[in-house]
Amino acid sequence: MSSVDQLIARTLGIAEARVTDEVEYQSIKEWDSLGHVSLMVALEKAYGVPIDDELTLSLRTVSAIREFAAGTTPQQGPAAPDDRAAVHRGLEGVVFDRTGITHIDGVAGVLEYRGYSIHDLAAHASFEEVAHLMIDGELPDAASLERFSKELHAARALPGPVLDLARSLAHAHPVEALRTCVSALAAFGQRRVDGSDETYEQARETGITLLGQIPMIVAAHHAFRNGREPLMPAEDTSYAEAVLTALLGESPTPAAVQFINRGLIVHADHSSNASAFVARVATGCRAGMTASLTAAVAAFGGSVHGGAAERVMTLLDQVGSPERAEAYVAELQGRGEPVMGFGHRVYRTEDPRVRHLRATVVALSEECGDTSGLETLDAVAAAMSPYSRHGVAANVDLYAGLAYRLLGLPDDLAVPLFVIGRTAGWVAQVLEQQSNNVLIRPLLSYTGPHARPFTKGNR
């Protein structure tokens, strides 16, 4: 076996016999996005040649990597056999519809909500303004903002059976409790409409109600598991202050409210992410707003989607100190395991949301007089720098969990807090999907046997 084949096998953690021309990116579980970046870094080290984005896209098959190692220019991926359609595993690079909500330029690191830069919104807007922008299409004037805020305030109260359900789930993980209670709202809400009959106006009303109720579910469950009754925030509190008041059971500091407001804004939407896609698929089935958001919450709790935010805190505790960061990263890479808080399917540079969350962590760390967590995460980011050139840069999950911990909130609330902000985007995407709806039904390429004879002996 050639040295490049050995490099591929060693980097991906597979037997050398599995390194064949038929193997390509995403065709085996070991050659996922992280495995591909690890391969590019290993090839750079072995051959002393920098691998740019264009070459990274070309080196997606064993045959192309063999050509590269032999000093020839690899072709742009294999052509699909005539009798088989091209397969896009993970739907990577597939554009399935159009949107007017969120624009992402992954190369330049740009994120815009309906044309407004995330940097301007995070610095100057309230979450209510951004939610209005998402759902109703424009930033509100004073009168529109007042009406919208009143809608959110009126939606906070939870039905008694849903509160009872949250109490009975005090032992459960907050994401599991949230998913279950959101689903229950469809049965106990004020308006019960079958999804196939739900009008745009009814869907919007339900969406606003969910935007008001979801943080109260998270807060009620947190209160019950801590042996206290839920606290209903005063009507005149902002959305961010209401969220934090309900969670803490007391009035928060202005600095804490400012962070929550900023965190909700940067989490509000991210185009066709996995959970938003799930919500659109459910909407395409005419499942209704509540069912679509229940599906989104379920997807969001997955460990490689929203669930990564909580796992970053496990990483922080395992690393322990800045001095151990480099060795920790090397250990994970050696085992072919991802480093939580790094890498994104879209961005080829740093996630534009990161700077806002890190700035908050800096401020909170200084306020608390404890910068150890920040220094450790920064050291991990430095250790990951060889991978950042290949798209595995810091993402939105890296600093969010530490900020919540500095506010005195447990690590397992990182995902529910992310969900609270993302609800605005889910509602907007469900409404956009509903306005020009279509059943989303892609195909699978069958690879099994054909024309197998059946006899009773097969049973």
PLM features: what roles do these ranges have?
Residues 1-80:
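Phosphopantetheine-dependent thiolation modules in NRPS/PKS and related acyl-activating systems
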Residues 78-459:
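Hydrophobic alpha-helical bundle cores within soluble ligand-binding/oligomerization subdomains
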